[in-house]
From Swiss-Prot:
Entries under HAMAP family matching the protein: Glu_tRNA_synth_type1
Cofactor entry: Zn(2+)
GO terms of molecular function: ATP binding; glutamate-tRNA ligase activity; tRNA binding; zinc ion binding
Description of how the protein assembles with itself and partners: Monomer.
Similarity-based family: Belongs to the class-I aminoacyl-tRNA synthetase family. Glutamate--tRNA ligase type 1 subfamily.
PROSITE patterns, A to Z: AA_TRNA_LIGASE_I
EC numbers: 6.1.1.17
One Gene Ontology term from the biological process aspect of the record: glutamyl-tRNA aminoacylation
Its biological purpose: Catalyzes the attachment of glutamate to tRNA(Glu) in a two-step reaction: glutamate is first activated by ATP to form Glu-AMP and then transferred to the acceptor end of tRNA(Glu).
Listed name of the protein: Glutamate--tRNA ligase
Reactions it catalyzes: tRNA(Glu) + L-glutamate + ATP = L-glutamyl-tRNA(Glu) + AMP + diphosphate
NCBIfam families: gltX_bact
Amino acid sequence: MTTKTRFAPSPTGFLHVGGARTALYSWLQARANNGEFVLRIEDTDIERSTQAACDAILEGMNWLGLTWDEGPYYQTKRFDRYNEIIAQMLAKGTAYKCYCSRERIDALREAQAANGEAQKYDGCCRDLPARDTDEPFVVRFKNPIGGSVVFDDHVRGRIEFSNDALDDLIIARTDGVPTYNFCVVVDDWDMGITCVVRGEDHINNTPRQINILKALGAPIPEYAHVSMILGDDGAKLSKRHGAVSVMQYRDDGYLPEALLNYLVRLGWSHGDQEIFSLEEMKQYFKLGDINKAASAFNTDKLVWLNQHYIKSLAPEYVATHLQWHMDDQEIDLSNGPALAEVVTALAERAKTLKELAASSRYFYEDFAEFDEAQAKKHLRGVALEPLQLVQQKLAALTDWTVEAIHQAIEDTATELDVGMGKVGMPLRVAVTGAGQSPGLDITLFLIGRSRSEQRISKAIEFVADRINS
C-alpha cells in the first residue's frame, strides 16, 4: 500500500513554525516511504478563513520547498460530497437530526457542571422517530455506546478512549454547513490518506473520527500526534517570543534550509547529528523517533544553523535568496559586482541574509559620510601618508586583481616600515565608510578600480581638512 500523508492547515492565520514542523514531518513520512503528500485547506470556518491567510500558507510551503503531489484541495468546494455522506448516514441510522434548542443545551451543561459531571450531549433526540417539521436542527453522529476506541500512535504509543466519554458529535450545523471533524474524516477517506501527522491538540478528535470512519466502513489511517513547541521560557510559543510566521523568518534573513533543519530537530533526532540536508532527512526520518515531550524553541540555535548554511551552500544559490533582501533594502545592483561574489566575500561574518544585504551596500552605492567613530579613530593625521602612498601604488597597477591589490597594500606597509594595520584600517574606512569588511584585497576588487580610487581621494581630502582645521 502506498504511503499517503497530508498537511491540512486552516486559513485563519499565517503558516506558523508549529504548522511548518507538522508539514515537514508529514512530508518526510511520505518522501521517506516513496509515498505521496497531499495539501488540503480546511476552510470550513467561513467567518475566520481569509484568502490572504490561504495565500500566505501556500507561499510559506513553496518557500520551504515542501512540494505536494495533490491539491491544494479546499473543503468549501466539497460541501456537496459531505452532504451526500450525511444523507447516507441519516438513511442508515448512523446519524440523526437533533432539534434541541440552544437554551436546552446550555441548561444541560450548567446542570452537568453543577453536579461535577462531564459536559456532553445526553442523547435526547438520538432515538426519536423522524419529524415532519420546519424546526431548526443539527445532525449528530450516533456514537457507539459502550466499548472503547484504541489506536497505536507512532509518537505516543497505545491510546484508548472509552466510548461512554464521547458524546454524539455534531456533524452538520443548523445552517447545513458540515463541521470540521466530519469533513476531515470524509477527506481522509476520499483522498486515501494512510497516515495522519498532526499536533497533539487533535488527540481528543481522533476517537470521534475513528468511530465515524468505522460507521462508514472506511479504512483507519495510522496516527502520529506531535507535541507543541514552547518558547525558551517554557510557555507555549507565541508572538511575544519573536517571529512565529514562516515568512517572517524569510523577512528576517533566514534560509529555508536553516529553518527546515532547525524544525526537523525540534523533537526528532538521529544520533548526535545536527546538520541535515533534505536528502538526509528523507533517508533517516522515522515517525517513531519523534520525542513525545514538548520542545523549546531556541533562536540562538537557529541563527547558528543559518550561519552554517550561508557559508556552506553555493554562493549562487544563496544569492537567489539574498536578492529579495537587496530589493527590500532598495539596494540597486546595476552598478556593482555579481551578487554571488558578494556572498562569497561576506558569508563568513553573516548571521542572516538581512545583515548580509545591509553590510553589502558599499559595494553598490557611494556613502555620504564616513562612520563618525571609525573616522575619528582611523582617519587622523597619521593616516595621510599611508593613504597617499597606497593610492599611488594602486593607481600604478596594470591589472586590477585581488593578488595585485594585496601586493600594493603590502608594499605600502613595507615601504613605510609600519604594520599592516596602519595602512589597512585607514584604507578600510576610506573605501567602505565603516570599520568592518572582508579582506581589503577582495573588498577593493569588488568595489572596482574607479570607485575605490574616488573613495581614497575623498578620505585623503577628509584627513587633510582635519589637519588644517
